[in-house]
Amino acid sequence: MNVSFSIAPYFFKERRAKLNSFRKRKVEIVAEIDSLLKNSSSLAIVEYRGLTVNELEQLRKEFKSAGVLSKVYKNRLFKIAAENNGYLDLQTDLVGPNLFAFGTTDAIAPAKIIAKNAKEQPLLILKGGIYDNQVVSAAENALISALPSYTEALTMLASGLQSPLKQLAFGLKLLIDEQKITA
């Protein structure tokens, strides 16, 4: 009987140390999520239930090539970090298996990539997220995915400015060729 009591303190001490290491790891993960929420320009939450490993890996490769950081976290730990940063409205989207895509360089890239892949893979569901430090719903995230990226917007602006000048130059060239005006 005394033997069992002498083993018990050792057993509980070891178990307590193991639980403390798990708790430390969870605190580190919450700090990592907290840092990502503060330093990224956007966040898109996507549910990936039913996707194969190959489909998920392909999605992650697309994220990586676009400069988007994608991670899978436990919803409870993400919820704690979101509350710490004042994003209380995200809690409704934190159900089921979620992939968190953080836009580090282009704020629209995560939503764009998810929307593009959701057309090919209907099991991929774009949920809410964060854009411009505001919590957005799934519908708003879908609208954001339709916006042009920064480089696309600049290209559209440049072509819009260049088109009238091209037409003017072409018209003047025709008038010169017909010799209605002199150069």
Swiss-Prot record:
Recorded superkingdom: Bacteria
GO MF term list: large ribosomal subunit rRNA binding
GO BP terms in the entry: translation
GO cellular component: ribonucleoprotein complex; ribosome
Pfam families: Ribosomal_L10
Keyword set includes Ribosomal protein: yes
Keyword Electron transport attached: no
Entry keyword set: Ribonucleoprotein, Ribosomal protein, RNA-binding, rRNA-binding
Function: Forms part of the ribosomal stalk, playing a central role in the interaction of the ribosome with GTP-bound translation factors.
Family the entry assigns: Belongs to the universal ribosomal protein uL10 family.
Assembly mode: Part of the ribosomal stalk of the 50S ribosomal subunit. The N-terminus interacts with L11 and the large rRNA to form the base of the stalk. The C-terminus forms an elongated spine to which L12 dimers bind in a sequential fashion forming a multimeric L10(L12)X complex.
Protein name per the record: Large ribosomal subunit protein uL10
Gene, per the UniProt record: rplJ
